[in-house]
Amino acid sequence: MELGLFTQPVHRPEKPWDQALAEDREAIILADQLGFSEVWIGEHFTTKAEQIPAPLMFMATLLKEAPSIRFATGVINLPYHNPVVVAAEVAQFDQLSDGRLILGIGPGGLMSDAELFGDKEMPERYRIALEGLDLMIKLWQEDAPLNHHGEFYDFSLEKRVWLSHGVGSMAKPFQQPYPPIALAMVG
């Protein structure tokens, strides 16, 4: 049997942020020492109770101190990000962790976050997240020339490339073709 730790993480709103982050780090290091197989870290922008707005950045601080545990985003709220940037950051983290990433993505469930990022309704956020995920997978599996013309995202990478010099190639994850992906659904 494998054990995992899912933490958003939640703290009392009055707890100082540096203290909350230190406690979260301690919990994950302990989970690694106890043999937990994975840890899931949430992402929220507008709450003092769940103060991790950048889970990949937070998890990167633990790579050496928690050398065995797999790190999972629980979740990256894709409608609040540019999926090209997320694809590059995910690939970089997966490389730094030697393939210990599980990518959790979702539409965003905290209503104050949704308001901050344009107050789109859940069905539209689902469509944005799924299109963004499709785009990320395309970026991980292909090199220029690339074109995407979707409902929410429109880009090309074909005119200003120099593939023989590596210009026009996006970062690829350590795990091929890409890290395991988990989709969060909110009802």
Model-derived regions, located:
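Short, flexible coil/linker segments at or flanking structured domains
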Residues: D24-A27, M57-M59, S68, G74, ...
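Internal, glycine-rich beta/alpha segment that forms the wall or movable "lid"
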Residues: N82-G187
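Flexible domain-boundary/linker segments
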Residues: A20, K48, L56, P79, ...
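Active-site beta-loop-alpha junctions enriched in small/polar residues
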Residues: Q8-V10, H44, I76-L78, G106-L110, ...
